[in-house]
């Protein structure tokens, strides 16, 4: 039985679905979705006010994700943005796939989770209630949990912490979470 389960993919992460082409890294739909929320044409590194001035460029590339320095004021060509974005997204999606074990997760759900993890970090997404529900087989509840607390009314993943340590709700972040939840369930 254990050998049969392994052959059927139960308990395995989703990297094998990527290897066989059942899930696509840096899909066109994901790249477009990321551009919607992270912006396009952001070629000059800026201090992101929502991230306490974290230097950010292109579609949300920061020093935490980039293999090259991200320095406020530097100019990145479109080609450099595309190259580094592809590396950053691929690396993030492979790490995300390691924590996803529900073989029913399809491209849309994977893309939604990829957007979430690109924004809040792979470790936070992997530790989220949403991923727990998705891995347990409840796709609908897991997708909803990207934007909402268990009560279905309280926004989640939609707050920033200011320099004084106070959490502040950001409507734009919640709009992104709602959009991710919608893509996730498609």
Model-derived segments and spans:
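Mid-length scaffold segments of soluble, non-membrane domains
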Residues: 74-129
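Amphipathic, alpha-helical segments enriched in basic
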Residues: 60, 67, 71, 114-117
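Long, amphipathic alpha-helical surface segments
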Residues: 3-22, 29-52, 61-63, 68, ...
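Small-residue-enriched, tightly packed secondary-structure blocks
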Residues: 54-59, 110
